[in-house]
From Swiss-Prot:
Residues that hold UMP according to the record: G60, D80, T141, G142, N143, P144, F145, F146, T147, T148
Species of the source: Acidiphilium cryptum (strain JF-5)
Keyword Kinase assigned: yes
Pfam families: AA_kinase (PF00696)
Keywords from the UniProt entry: ATP-binding, Cytoplasm, Kinase, Nucleotide-binding, Pyrimidine biosynthesis, Transferase
Name of the gene: pyrH
Subcellular location(s) per record: Cytoplasm
Record's protein name: Uridylate kinase
Length: 246
């Protein structure tokens, strides 16, 4: 199948993938698992080969979570800034893994740190993606009290993405954690209102609200299932879709 054929079989032109920091831990309790990072990078490379424009937001919970630091007595804003720096570390690790697979990648940080990455500039990020480069947005929104889920929704809207994908540890949204509740119900499709009304642990309310106000579909899938990202691009496999109306 040629690259053009692959493009014709995908549903989306430009997408944002949100990956939690915890997803990069693999079976570790802390930090980065290089095999897991490599596997996710390969899945991203496969989607780039389909000529889909890809950007990413990566969390930092595998290294530091601001809200946990605040719970331990640390100033919340200070703790959140530490969490933002953790996302930069994860972004650099993913950039390295992608470039080893021949995927041109740029990291843009909402907190300028010119020695290691570019500052976040919306139009520059768009140009990178138009040229087939992956762009990883680091440091969240650059402001404390906002999660990386909110940053993902914000960047997806700014980049005019067709869909926001959240790669998680399970294959969609459930009524309860399926790893703890055997009979948890899996949803194939939900509305933004249902997610908020049922208090489902998908994304925080701010992220859902941004998506809803801008008619941005959200797809939740298992980031650890090999090839799942590419399958979702073709409308295949198991996932949950969140939209305005079912």
């Amino acid at each position: 199948m040629t690259a053009q054929d692959q493009t014709d079989h995908t549903r989306y032109r430009r997408v944002l993938l949100k990956v939690s920091g915890e997803a990069l831990m693999g079976r570790r309790d802390y930090g980065l698992d290089t095999d897991t990072v490599a596997a996710i990078a390969q899945d991203i490379a496969d989607v780039v080969a389909m000529r889909v424009e890809v950007c990413l937001v990566i969390g930092g919970g595998n290294i530091f979570r601001g809200i946990s630091g605040a719970a331990g007595g640390m100033d919340r804003a200070q703790a959140d800034y530490m969490g933002m720096l953790a996302t930069v570390m994860n972004a650099l690790a993913m950039q390295s893994a992608l470039e080893k697979r021949g995927v041109a990648t740029r990291v843009q940080s909402a907190i300028p740190m010119s020695a290691v990455c570019e500052p976040y500039i919306r139009r520059r990020a768009e140009r990178h993606m138009e040229k087939g480069r992956v762009v990883i947005f680091a440091a969240g929104t650059g402001n404390p009290f906002f999660t990386t889920d909110t940053a993902a929704a914000l960047r997806a809207v700014e980049m005019k993405c067709d869909v926001l994908l959240k790669g998680t540890q399970v294959d969609g949204v459930y009524s309860a954690d399926p790893r703890k509740v055997a009979d948890a119900e899996r949803y194939a499709e939900l509305t933004y209102h249902e997610v908020l009304a049922r208090d489902l642990s998908v994304m925080d309310a701010a992220a859902i609200s941004i998506a809803r106000e801008n008619d941005l579909p959200i797809i939740v899938f298992n980031i650890h299932a090999p090839g799942a990202f590419a399958s979702v691009m073709r409308g295949e496999g198991k996932f949950t879709r969140i939209v305005e109306q079912r």
